[in-house]
C-alpha cells in the first residue's frame, strides 16, 4: 500500500495494525484509515473498464439519459446477451456523446428525457448477429420480425455485416414514455420512420428526428430509433468489450 494513500485519508488516523508479511492490510484497518468513500475510490479501477481513447461514457456527460442497453441482456432479437457487452453501459465517441448530451439538455428543458438502447457496438457483437442469422432458432420471431423471413433481415437493411455503431458514432434511442408505434428493434415496414400517416406516434417520430437533427444526428429511414452523427468520415471501427 503506497504511504500517500494512507496519509491522505480523510480521517488521517493511523492504522491500528501493521501489514502482514506479504504487505497486505486487513479490510477493517483500511476502513478505519480511509473511510467508506476512500475504499470505494481504491476499488473503483477494478469495477469498470475504460472506454477506448477518444470515447466517453454517456453517463459522465449526460446522466439524465436513461440507459436500457438491450444487448447486454436477453431482451433483444437474439434472445440472449450479445458477445462484447459485459456491462450495460453506453459508450460513444466523445463528439457524439457531447452532441447527445446537448440533445438531452434540450429535451429536459422541454419536459422529457431520452432513453438509449444501444450505442458503441463491438465488432464481435456484429459478428454474433451474423452467426445468429444463420441458425434455425426463431423463438424471437413473433416479437421482433413477424413479417420478415430471418434470412432476409440483412437484405432488407435491418441488420448489417458492418455497423456504424462500431465507430461509436451511432446510437439507438427513443423518449421515455412516448409512443413510437413500434418497439425498438421491431424489424418491419411499420418501423420505417416515415411509414405512419397519422396519429401521435407519427408526430413523436417527427419530433425526435427534428431534435436529433438540430444536434447533428441523421436518422436511418428504416429505423425510427437509429441516428448517426453526421460529418465524420473514415472513422475506425473497434472491437473493445464494454465492461
Language-model segments: which ranges?
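Bacterial N-terminal signal peptides that target proteins for export
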Residues: 6, 11, 20-35
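Conserved metal-phosphate-binding beta-hairpin within the catalytic cores
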Residues: 227
